[in-house]
């Protein structure tokens, strides 16, 4: 079984232009993501998908593989699918290009359900919410699942909505596991053919309302396997986030 991890990386970014090439202890951020992804035991190969020659050149400079893509893609999934269509891989992993601290074990955790069960078309991760701030924040995507670990819904709103427990919503309640709530970790695994099918689906109502692309899958009647992980990463959206990464690496 051939499993390819693809890292979409753009140069243009509203909040942090050129972040894929931001220096982190002597290496561009995309190199950190690439090298950590390559350490996942289930990954056969790693490819950076980019629309910018500067990023491609940086990847080639450290010996990595980069594939050029169109500049007109509206989503990272479209960029992913363009590259996946050129490959003969069985499974495609979408690793965010702005997570230089991603744990290789997280990637393996997300891949495992698809590697073991041919009926699983798509998978992702969740981790426990530990603070009230994260539970209430629209920037933290929440997920609820059924007893078999398949997603019921993703939302920027609090999930679940504790009708009779608002007075119990305190940090200690989340930390003590009195309230079990989960945030979505944006790492996706697809069967290649399903990814290409997904990219052809039209945007859906709930997807556009929540601005969450994965809802398109649920609205079209497909299932997403969600695996719980104890690992957490830091997404770099701003220069301030980059400082947090540097602080953690120095410890």
Swiss-Prot record:
NCBIfam families according to UniProt: kdsB (TIGR00466), PRK05450.1-3 (NF003950), PRK05450.1-5 (NF003952), PRK13368.1 (NF009905)
Keyword Cytoplasm: yes
Keywords linked to the UniProt accession: Cytoplasm, Lipopolysaccharide biosynthesis, Nucleotidyltransferase, Transferase
Family: Belongs to the KdsB family.
GO CC terms: cytosol
Record InterPro entries: Cytidylyl_trans (IPR003329), KdsB (IPR004528), Nucleotide-diphossugar_trans (IPR029044)
Reactions the enzyme catalyzes: 3-deoxy-alpha-D-manno-oct-2-ulosonate + CTP = CMP-3-deoxy-beta-D-manno-octulosonate + diphosphate
Biological process, per Gene Ontology: CMP-keto-3-deoxy-D-manno-octulosonic acid biosynthetic process; lipopolysaccharide biosynthetic process
Keyword set includes Nucleotidyltransferase: yes
Main location: cytoplasm
Domain of life: Bacteria
Pathway(s) the chain acts in: Nucleotide-sugar biosynthesis; CMP-3-deoxy-D-manno-octulosonate biosynthesis; CMP-3-deoxy-D-manno-octulosonate from 3-deoxy-D-manno-octulosonate and CTP: step 1/1; Bacterial outer membrane biogenesis; lipopolysaccharide biosynthesis
GO molecular function terms listed in the Swiss-Prot or TrEMBL record: 3-deoxy-manno-octulosonate cytidylyltransferase activity
Pfam families, per database record: CTP_transf_3
Entry protein name: 3-deoxy-manno-octulosonate cytidylyltransferase
Enzyme class: transferase
Function, in words: Activates KDO (a required 8-carbon sugar) for incorporation into bacterial lipopolysaccharide in Gram-negative bacteria.
CDD domains tied to this protein: CMP-KDO-Synthetase
Enzyme Commission numbers on file: 2.7.7.38
Gene (UniProt): kdsB
SUPFAM superfamilies: Nucleotide-diphospho-sugar transferases
Localisation: Cytoplasm
């Amino acid at each position: 079984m051939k499993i390819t991890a693809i890292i979409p990386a753009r140069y243009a970014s509203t909040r942090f232009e050129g972040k894929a090439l931001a220096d982190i202890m002597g290496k561009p951020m995309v190199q950190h993501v690439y090298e950590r992804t390559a350490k996942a035991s289930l990954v056969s190969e790693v490819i950076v998908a980019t629309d910018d020659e500067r990023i491609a050149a940086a990847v080639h400079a450290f010996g990595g593989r980069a594939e050029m893509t169109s500049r007109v893609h509206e989503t990272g999934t479209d960029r992913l699918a363009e590259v996946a269509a050129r490959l003969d891989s069985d499974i495609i992993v979408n690793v965010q290009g702005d997570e230089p601290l991603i744990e290789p074990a997280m990637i393996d955790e997300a891949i495992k359900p698809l590697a073991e069960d041919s009926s699983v078309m798509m998978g992702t991760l969740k981790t426990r919410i530990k603070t009230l701030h994260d539970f209430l924040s629209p920037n933290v995507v929440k997920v609820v699942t059924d007893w078999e670990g398949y997603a019921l819904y993703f939302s920027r709103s609090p999930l679940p909505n504790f009708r009779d427990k608002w007075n119990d919503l305190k940090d200690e309640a989340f930390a003590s596991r009195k309230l079990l709530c989960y945030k979505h970790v944006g790492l996706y695994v697809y069967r290649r053919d399903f990814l290409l099918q997904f990219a052809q689906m039209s945007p859906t109502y709930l997807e556009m309302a929540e601005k969450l692309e994965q809802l398109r899958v649920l609205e079209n009647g497909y299932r997403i396997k969600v695996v719980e992980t104890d690992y957490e990463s830091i997404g770099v959206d701003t220069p301030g986030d980059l400082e947090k990464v540097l602080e953690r690496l120095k410890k």
